[in-house]
Amino acid sequence: MGFRLRNVPLLSRVGADRADHLRTDLDAALEGWAEAVVLRVDERSQVMVVDEQVVLSPAAELGDSPPGNGVFLGRLPDGRHAWAVRAPLQAPDGVPARVIDPRRAGVPFDDVSAQLVTCALALLNWHDAAGFSPADGSPTRPIRGGWARRNLLTGHEEFPRVDPAVICLVHDGHDRAVLARQVVWPPRLFSLLAGFVEAGESFETCVAREIYEEIGLDVTDVTYLGSQPWPFPRSLMVGFHALADPEQEFSFNDGEIAEAAWFTRDEVCEALAHGDWGSDSTSRLLLPGSISIAREIIESWAFHA
């Protein structure tokens, strides 16, 4: 049974112009700063939201020009420039804002907010770990609006690292799919199987290897579905579905999976109706929230006609 994603995964949605040509145009950056807005991300990678929109504060509050730790996110639909900084959160006056951890957010962002938060986290997390060159240990400094760093000794430019990982829904081609729980997860929390791509490995080969290593099943017909950035701290999740035989026994070979089982479509639909991992439901099966491509893949399979 083939199926497609019903919707673009939340963190893959585009609501703003990345405006990469402005990253090296210092004059344009300075000219736009007076009307620009800033997304604050605190040390715990939390942000503030009002309804489905992330809180953006006036850039001028930070000074007359972009700070050294600022990263340029792009241009909003109304033309204003958007930046991000690692800084304490500030709620706007008279607005009921709340602090959220994007990784655990249960309420979807609008498209603009999703793009800004994803981009901000990916860049800021990289800068936190990239103060020194991996080649010679020399200090580096941000350039290109925060989209690169330059080695102060050699002048070599370094760019954000992205770690690709696969995530796959294994099904029988009919009415059953495999869901699994990692050892570190509490009881009742299940999701899809996932793992990082190794050097010299294709996505499809990685899917087959990871599933065999984690639960001992052989898969065929590995089919691409879609992808989603996962900036926690720097992954790109590449989604697939694949076929397996329900008669083949599970074996938990690498110690990462505590349990796995075949669930019927009706069981999965019932679990989806009970919310997600953050729900207070007593359901025996709780599934990931909308922030993850796992949810979109599961829903797309469950509701496929």
Predicted regions and their residues:
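Short glycine/proline-enriched turns and hinge-like loops at secondary-structure junctions
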Residues: G145, V162-D163, S191, R234-S235, ...
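Active-site-adjacent beta-strand/loop module that shapes the phosphate/pyrophosphate-binding cleft
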Residues: Q228-S251
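The catalytic Nudix box helix
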Residues: S191-L225, F240
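Cys/His-rich short segments
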Residues: T118-L169
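N-terminal strand-loop-strand
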Residues: R149-S191, F196, D218-V219, A244
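Nudix hydrolase/Nudix homology domain
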Residues: M1-A130, R141, W185-F190, N253-A305
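Short, contiguous acidic/charged loop-to-helix segments that flank catalytic cores in large enzymes
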Residues: G195, A199, Q228-P231, R284-L285
